[in-house]
């Protein structure tokens, strides 16, 4: 949510739409909770802040593989006068040349890159320049908060507190549904 908030502020966006994937393509996750749980956690994380953030189930409803280009085209059809930004972390943006129909992705939206430790701006720029139109990407600062989704899942699995590290409603949802707890089988 910090990344979404920073993009909203620094890029002067009117709204940020969170679109959870039905099957996350770029980051396989052990004990993946499923699309419906991820969708609900996004809704809980943005509750009370609907003026800035919207959660959409576009990719979850779609049959078959869900590609970013399809989502962007669907958004363009439903919001033809909107300028779209695709918000990505630097690590993901560096892999954009390998995406399905990457050239169409960058023709549909301005790529907005959250700078993160571990992936240099130069590496991302080189990657974006490999995709015709990608050189129009924009960067925004991401504060180093020392919290990652991997770290949060590890803390949940180890029964360590995640209080103050994520929205209370999301933490309570994870606890209630016993998500990310690991398998009881050995």
Task: Indicate residue ranges for each PLM-predicted region.
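Nucleotidyltransferase catalytic core that binds NTPs
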Residues: 1-186
